[in-house]
């Protein structure tokens, strides 16, 4: 049976769509969508996957792993070298929560809007 659905887009809530899109563009190499503006910005991968960022008034960033402000979304990215990727992403504006449950297998970081994401080895 062929798949019923095909993932074409992922959209994250945030306070500043353009700033969050800039972070992910530098981190992933996705291309900025020409229709991006201050309320909704997007990035497109070569195969068409769209990553969107929408402005939400009163946005409250997740405080992972605090369940009172849950993670709201979760992205996983594979990398060749955890330490190198973490260093570059921190320079780009990512954060590193104190709680790290993955040991040497994965790292949890947060984007500039507070969304947690994981880096895992290829």
Where are these predicted regions, by residue range?
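A short, acidic/glycine-rich surface segment
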Residues: 58-64
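Active-site beta-strand termini and strand-to-loop segments that position acidic
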Residues: 43-47, 109-112, 121-122
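Mid-chain, well-packed structural core segment of small domains
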Residues: 67-89
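A detector for short, charged/polar N-terminal pre-domain segments
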Residues: 1-2, 65
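Core segments of cupin and vicinal oxygen chelate
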Residues: 2-5, 11-57, 84-87, 91-105
């Amino acid at each position: 049976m062929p798949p019923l659905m095909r993932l074409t887009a992922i959209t994250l809530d945030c306070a500043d769509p353009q700033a969050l899109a800039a972070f992910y563009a530098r981190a992933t190499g996705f291309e900025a969508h020409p229709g991006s503006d201050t309320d909704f910005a997007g990035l497109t991968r070569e195969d068409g996957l769209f990553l969107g960022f929408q402005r939400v008034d009163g946005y409250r960033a997740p405080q992972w792993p605090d369940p009172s402000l849950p993670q709201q979304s979760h992205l996983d990215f594979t990398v060749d070298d955890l330490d190198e990727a973490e260093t570059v992403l921190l320079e780009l504006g990512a954060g590193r929560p104190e709680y790290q449950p993955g040991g040497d297998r994965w790292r949890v970081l947060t984007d500039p809007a507070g969304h947690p994401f994981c880096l895992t080895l290829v």
